[in-house]
Amino acid sequence: MYVGRFIVVAPDRAAYRVSSRSFPNRRIVDRDGTLTVGPTEDAPETDNPYISYNCLRTVGDDYAVVGNGTQVDPIAEKLSLGYPPRDALAESLLALDYEKDDYDTPRIAGVVGDESYIGTVRRDALIVEAVEEPTLVATYEKSEPEPTSLGADDPSELAAELYDRDLEHPVCAAGVVADGDSFEVGYYNGE
């Protein structure tokens, strides 16, 4: 099944996977603790605004944010200004809305912290829910948050776990795990 990009958020960890039929030549790089999706060196040039973005950011030792696009940055910024996680997620998703591409691709994002949330904004809905167990939401087919499993405790292993899920067209994945008073991040580019 092709579900597109997806996230899994749990109370103490989260992960994000890029799945793509159209733009498979992407990878994740670590830029001082911020994980960024971008094209590989052999990727064809494109003016598509949805190809490169920060997919995982931490906000001090308090929060981690994951998502499938540029909404990660304003969510992190609002959290750093003291917004509650639910409000930072809802306001940023609502402000940016779904992606204005040929598919009206939903934006998905999650926050891990003292309170953890998952959210999506689609053409027909804005959904933000508290997370008590591992919860998945995807851009296609699984566009409503639903319970799932999440086993790994190491961020890179968590990313590999999502990459290896039996869902079509994996490209790369990112993971974050709460480690006491801070967060550890990792990624997997299928190598």
Swiss-Prot record:
GO terms for biological process: 'de novo' IMP biosynthetic process. Pathway: Purine metabolism; IMP biosynthesis via de novo pathway; IMP from 5-formamido-1-(5-phospho-D-ribosyl)imidazole-4-carboxamide: step 1/1. Gene3D superfamilies: Inosine monophosphate cyclohydrolase-like. Signal peptide: none annotated. Disulfide bonds: none annotated. Keywords: Hydrolase, Purine biosynthesis. Its EC number is 3.5.4.10. This is IMP cyclohydrolase. HAMAP family: IMP_cyclohydrol (MF_00705). It is an enzyme of class 3 (hydrolase). It comes from Natronomonas pharaonis (strain ATCC 35678 / DSM 2160 / CIP 103997 / JCM 8858 / NBRC 14720 / NCIMB 2260 / Gabara). Belongs to the archaeal IMP cyclohydrolase family. GO terms for molecular function: IMP cyclohydrolase activity. It comes from the Archaea. Transmembrane segments: none annotated. It catalyses: IMP + H2O = 5-formamido-1-(5-phospho-D-ribosyl)imidazole-4-carboxamide. Catalyzes the cyclization of 5-formylamidoimidazole-4-carboxamide ribonucleotide to IMP. The lineage of its organism: Archaea, Methanobacteriati, Methanobacteriota, Stenosarchaea group, Halobacteria.
